[in-house]
Swiss-Prot record:
Subcellular localization, as worded in the UniProt entry: Nucleus; Chromosome
Compositional bias per record (Acidic residues), positions renumbered to this chain: 373-389, 407-443
Record-linked CDD domains: PH2-like_Rtt106
Description of how the protein assembles with itself and partners: Interacts with histones H3 and H4.
Any one GO MF annotation of this record: DNA binding
Gene3D superfamilies xrefs: 2.30.29.120, Pleckstrin-homology domain (PH domain)/Phosphotyrosine-binding domain (PTB) (2.30.29.30)
Family: Belongs to the RTT106 family.
Keywords: Chaperone, Chromosome, DNA-binding, Nucleus, Transcription, Transcription regulation
Entry protein name: Histone chaperone RTT106
Taxonomic lineage: Eukaryota, Fungi, Dikarya, Ascomycota, Saccharomycotina
Length: 443
């Protein structure tokens, strides 16, 4: 039984126990082993099939680099958040169209190879603006880092953060801005602690607006200025800001922190111009919703408490059976209710807050709940950002407030002061060393 040692140890023990109990079985086991070893019909367990390696597709072939002769205007190494989250160049350049050279817009790498291009600017671009960033506008070292938003007719928008200090250095190095311009403009400014961007950066904004105009694109400027009589902040908090483009008390821009589902973002309301209707934008790390004010059928307020309120916006949507869609934003700070409501009224949007039939319809509408649930279940981004925290605190109802006031009115003043401090101190937002936010693109 020399073959016994070739068996696995547990099987050796079993065979040895069998032979010990039935010694006459040993010859039979020898014959069985010999037959199994030499028989051509022996059974072998096939090896499991190897998984075929997934052949990774080759990276897409990039177009040839742009030549300096083709470039109209180029901002290098800016922080893009959409459609790619990486540092790229933002370039207007000439491209060959059916009827000859036409202006095009591309996001390019360091070798000036386009990684994303728009060849028909008039049809591809819906809306283009410069916007302040919540949390940056209240900090002097960060207020000159702003948002460049290019909303497209199809696909994700182009979202870039512009650090005007970096833009200034590039343009000075290229000889497009005099090296003495900064000191000359700063000396003319009388306000050292102004809330708006620095005078040199105001000049850079005007330069950018002209470059966009050369390519047939209107760049709307909603950045607060420190000089002149236009673009003045009327409200500047970490969680909300308001701006008048005419330097009056009438706000043309309102940006407030809001929630959609459990995700917090920024709700941006922009007033209309002579040739463009007002615009409403909302986004988390990047804008995900944009619709014109003239597409809004009505707006309503709900869950109004001492601290917060919700706002529901109903817009035209031909894909829905009833031709409309309602989007709800929640947990807006009650301190900003009047500013937002005044803006809505000036835009001529119908306030339907007291329509009981509408309230019941919203409660029963599965689309509203489905969209909210979808936002709650949204997978985290694949980049290195920290995951958004999920807001878990309950909304305090009016009946709860009344009960608390009856149980202990002596504590109301302390609670009010604490609540106010928490509201103003929240959501400061961390920034990278170059002053650019690694988190929310709008807030």
């Amino acid at each position: 039984m020399q073959w016994l040692h070739t068996l696995p140890p547990p099987l050796q023990d079993e065979v040895a126990a069998l032979i010990s109990a039935v010694p006459q079985a040993a010859p039979t086991l020898d014959k069985l082993f010999e037959y199994a070893s030499n028989s051509p019909q022996k059974q072998k367990i096939p090896d499991p099939p190897r998984k075929k390696r997934q052949q990774t597709s080759a990276p897409p072939q990039l177009p040839p680099p742009l030549t300096q002769a083709d470039i109209i205007f180029h901002l290098s190494n800016i922080s893009c958040q959409s459609p790619f989250r990486k540092r790229l160049g933002f370039a207007f350049h000439l491209a060959l169209g059916p009827q000859g050279p036409v202006p095009a817009l591309s996001l390019v790498n360091n070798q000036l190879q386009p990684e994303f291009s728009l060849m028909n600017l008039g049809q591809d671009i819906v809306f283009c603006s410069l916007l302040p960033i919540l949390g940056n506008s209240t900090v002097s070292s960060k207020k000159d880092t702003v948002l460049l938003l290019v909303w497209l007719a199809h696909g994700d928008p182009i979202v870039c953060q512009l650090n005007f200090d970096a833009v200034k250095k590039q343009l000075v190095a290229e000889g497009k801005v005099p090296a003495s311009a900064e000191s000359e403009l700063d000396s003319e400014s009388e306000e050292d602690d102004a809330e708006g961007i620095r005078p040199i950066n105001e000049a850079l904004v005007d330069f950018l607006v002209r470059q966009f105009q050369l390519c047939g694109i209107r760049l709307l400027n909603y950045l607060p200025f420190s000089t002149g009589s236009k673009n003045k902040l009327t409200l500047n908090k970490d969680t909300a800001l308001a701006l008048s483009t005419n330097g009056t008390s009438v706000n043309d821009v309102v940006i407030v922190q809001a929630y959609r589902g459990s995700k917090d973002g920024a709700l941006v309301l922009l007033g209309g111009t002579q040739d463009q209707p007002g615009t409403i934008i909302f986004g988390f790390r990047k804008p995900i919703l944009l619709f014109r004010a003239n597409s809004v059928k009505r707006i309503s307020y709900s869950n109004i408490t001492r601290l917060t309120f919700n706002v529901s916006v109903t817009v035209h949507n031909d894909t829905r059976p009833d031709g409309e869609e309602t989007i709800e934003f929640s947990m807006l700070d009650q301190a900003y209710f009047q500013i937002l409501d005044d803006f809505v009224k000036r835009q001529g949007i119908n306030d339907d807050s007291f329509n009981e039939a509408l309230r019941e319809k919203q409660k029963a509408d599965p689309n509203v709940k489905a969209e909210t649930d979808a936002e709650d279940a949204e997978a985290p981004d694949s980049d290195d950002e920290e995951e958004d925290g999920t807001y878990q605190a309950g909304v305090e109802s009016d009946s709860d407030n009344e009960k608390k006031e009856e149980d202990g009115e002596e504590n109301s003043e302390d609670e009010d002061s604490e609540d106010g401090e928490e509201s103003e101190d929240s959501e400061d937002g961390e920034l990278s060393e170059d002053g650019e936010s690694d988190d929310l693109s709008l807030s």
